[in-house]
A protein has these predicted regions:
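Short, solvent-exposed turn/loop segments enriched in Gly/Ser/Thr/Pro and often Arg
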Residues: 1-2, 55-63, 212-215
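Beta-rich nucleic-acid/ligand-interaction surfaces
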Residues: 60-67, 86-90, 216-219
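Short, surface-exposed basic-aromatic patches at helix termini and helix-loop junctions that form
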Residues: 48-49, 65-80, 190-203
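CE4/NodB-like, metal-dependent polysaccharide N-deacetylase domain
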Residues: 27, 31-58, 154-175
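The substrate-binding groove and active-site-proximal loops of carbohydrate-active enzymes
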Residues: 20-35, 51-59, 134-149, 180-187
Length: 355
C-alpha cells in the first residue's frame, strides 16, 4: 500500500522534523500495522521475484529509529533513503557541495551506516546522493547519452579525488523514486542506461556492487548512528503527508475507522473472512498517496478523485463487515466548509453530522 511507515507507527513523529505541524486530533499509533505492511510488501516481492529480498527502499524513503526493528525482524539487511536523513541524524545542517555539485565530505555520505538496534541484526542504511540522482532524474534526459554519461562519470571521479583515505572503498548510491524519468528520455532511456552500465563496468577505478555484497565484505568496518532521524528521502520531515488541515482531517478519518475495526475485531459479531477483508481495505487506506494530494503543497489537478477513493476505502472497511459507513465519509475532505474540528471534545464534526 506504499505507507509512510513512521507515520503509521505514530503520527506524533511528524513533529520531530516539523515542530509547527498540525497534528491529528486523534493520534494514529499502529506499530503492528506498520510491521504488517513491511511483511506483506516482502511477501509480494518474494512471490513475484522468486526469492525474498534482503534489502528494500521503504515507501518514499520514509524511515525513523522506531521502524528499524520491523525491517530486521523480516530479515532485511539493508534499507536506503535520502541524504537529508543522514545529515539530520548526524546533526549537521546539510551536506556541503563545491561549485560542481560534489560533496566536500564524501567519506560521510558515500558509506552505509548501521541503524543501531543494540543487537546483532542491525540494519545497514545507504544514503542517496541527491545531486547525481537528481541529474539522472531531471537533467540527463535533455542531453545525448554520451554527454550525460560523461557528466556522471566526471562527477563520480571528482568525488573520488576529494575523498580522504578510508579503510574501505566509498560507495555511491544513485536512486530514483517516483520521478518517472525514462519517459522523458530518448528511446525511453534505453540508450542512456545501456551506455551508463557499459561505462560503469569497464572503468578500472570503479566497481559496481550491490548493497548486500558491500555489507557482507565491509560490515565490521561500518559505523553506527546513535539514532535515525524521522524523515523521507526528499525532505527532512513528513510535511508532504501530514501537518496541513486537510491532511489532519484525513488522518483523523483513518484513526476513527481503525478504532472501529479494533472494536469489531474484539467482538464475536463477524466472520474471520469479513475481518480479513475489512483489514485489507484498512491497509490500503494507510497508503501514502492519499495523503500526498491533500493540502496545498501538492496538486494532481484532480484531487477530488483521490479524496473520493480514500474515503471509499474507509467506507469499505465498514461495508465489508455489513455495517453502514458513517455519514461523514460522504463529505469531501477538501471542502473546507464541510467540516469543523471540535478540539475540546476530541472529535470530528461535519456541518451536519458528528461522529
Amino acid at each position: 500500500a506504499h505507507p509512510i511507515l513512521p507515520l503509521i507507527f505514530d503520527t506524533n513523529l511528524a513533529a520531530v522534523g516539523d515542530i509547527g505541524a498540525e497534528l491529528p486530533t486523534n493520534r494514529f499509533n499502529k506499530p503492528t500495522d506498520a510491521a504488517i505492511q513491511v511483511e506483506k510488501g516482502l511477501d509480494l516481492a518474494e512471490k513475484l521475484l522468486g526469492q525474498r529480498p534482503t534489502g528494500m527502499w521503504p515507501a518514499e524513503g520514509a524511515v525513523s529509529q522506531e521502524v528499524l526493528g520491523m525491517f530486521a525482524k523480516e530479515g532485511v539487511k539493508w534499507i536506503a533513503t535520502g541524504e537529508h536523513v543522514l545529515s539530520k541524524s548526524l546533526d549537521i545542517p546539510t551536506f556541503k557541495r563545491n561549485t560542481d555539485g560534489i560533496v566536500t565530505n564524501p567519506e560521510v555520505l558515500y558509506t552505509p551506516w548501521y541503524g543501531q538496534l543494540n543487537r546483532q541484526d542491525d540494519v545497514a542504511i545507504f544514503f542517496r546522493d541527491l545531486s547525481i540522482s537528481d541529474q539522472v532524474g531531471f537533467t540527463y534526459s535533455g542531453m545525448s547519452p554520451e554527454m550525460a554519461v560523461a557528466d556522471m562519470m566526471k562527477a563520480l571521479e571528482a568525488a573520488r579525488e576529494v575523498s580522504t583515505t578510508m579503510d574501505r572503498p566509498l560507495v555511491v548510491s544513485i536512486v530514483l523514486d517516483g520521478e518517472n524519468a525514462w519517459e522523458h528520455y530518448q528511446n525511453d532511456g534505453i540508450d542512456f542506461l545501456s551506455l551508463m552500465y557499459e561505462t560503469l563496468t569497464t572503468t578500472d577505478w570503479l566497481k559496481t556492487t550491490t548493497p548486500t555484497e558491500y555489507i557482507e565484505k565491509y560490515g565490521p568496518q561500518i559505523e553506527k548512528l546513535d539514532r535515525v532521524f524521522p524523515a523521507s528521502w526528499f525532505q527532512p520531515n513528513f510535511a508532504t503527508w501530514i501537518g496541513e488541515t486537510e491532511e489532519t482531517y484525513a488522518w483523523d478519518y483513518l484513526q476513527k475507522t481503525r478504532a472501529f475495526y479494533d472494536r469489531a475485531n474484539a467482538s464475536d459479531n463477524y466472520t474471520e473472512k469479513q475481518l480479513e477483508q475489512a483489514f485489507d481495505y484498512m491497509l490500503l487506506a494507510e497508503g501514502s498517496d492519499w495523503f500526498w494530494w491533500y493540502g496545498s503543497d501538492q496538486s494532481s489537478g484532480n484531487d477530488d478523485y483521490f479524496g473520493s477513493a480514500f474515503r471509499n476505502l474507509l467506507k469499505n472497511v465498514y461495508s465489508s463487515l455489513g455495517e453502514e459507513p458513517p455519514a461523514y465519509l460522504d463529505i469531501p475532505i477538501i471542502s473546507p466548509s464541510a467540516q469543523l474540528f471540535d478540539k475540546q471534545s476530541d472529535s470530528i464534526l461535519t456541518s451536519n453530522q458528528s461522529l
